[in-house]
């Protein structure tokens, strides 16, 4: 698990999926609990989570009182709806305004989709350029933003959210 420094009062973390194949020592869930995680953003679908962990992760999180948001992105791919994706970026920024928030973002390995999300979040919430956002996230998560398509999405993020002219 990686702590992502940010200027907001809340804490921002990134990780692999608990109980999944990248949670090698099966300790992430205990780490979530010891770190006081209050919010989880899942970038995996329920089906992907269930296939990897053999349980309903969203239900587990909710049963322990966590706020759960889901914005599934297929593995190694990019978001298909920039408007909904941008709304999720802002939802995370809003949640981090609360000093009692500890929010973790995860996909399967915690690198590709998680890195993509955080690099776009850094552009929206921190005002970083696309190139600086990519460097920023890779400083915290080695190997973040795994595919060329994901990298291109990050680098062209500002163009995807500009108002469209007729």
Q: PLM features: residue spans?
A:
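Cys-dependent protein tyrosine phosphatase-like superfamily
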Residues: 1-104, 116-166
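Short cysteine clusters
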Residues: 107
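Conserved G/P- and acidic residue-centered "switch" motifs that form tight phosphate/ATP-binding loops
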Residues: 110
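Conserved SAM/SAH-binding loop-helix junction
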Residues: 113
């Amino acid at each position: 698990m990686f702590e992502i420094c940010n200027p907001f009062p809340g804490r921002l973390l990134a990780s692999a999926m608990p109980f999944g194949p990248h949670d090698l020592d099966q300790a992430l869930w205990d780490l979530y609990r010891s770190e006081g995680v209050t919010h989880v953003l899942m970038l995996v679908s329920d089906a992907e989570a269930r296939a990897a962990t053999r349980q309903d992760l969203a239900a587990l999180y909710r049963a322990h009182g966590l706020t759960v948001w889901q914005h599934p992105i297929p593995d190694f791919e990019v978001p298909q709806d920039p408007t909904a994706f941008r709304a999720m970026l802002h939802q995370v920024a809003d949640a981090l305004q609360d000093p009692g928030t500890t929010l973790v973002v995860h996909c399967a390995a915690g690198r590709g989709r998680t890195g993509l999300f955080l690099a776009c979040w850094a552009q929206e919430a921190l005002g970083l350029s696309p190139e600086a956002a990519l460097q920023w996230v890779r400083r915290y998560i080695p190997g973040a933003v795994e595919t060329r398509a994901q990298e291109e999405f990050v680098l062209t993020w500002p163009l995807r959210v500009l108002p469209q002219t007729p």
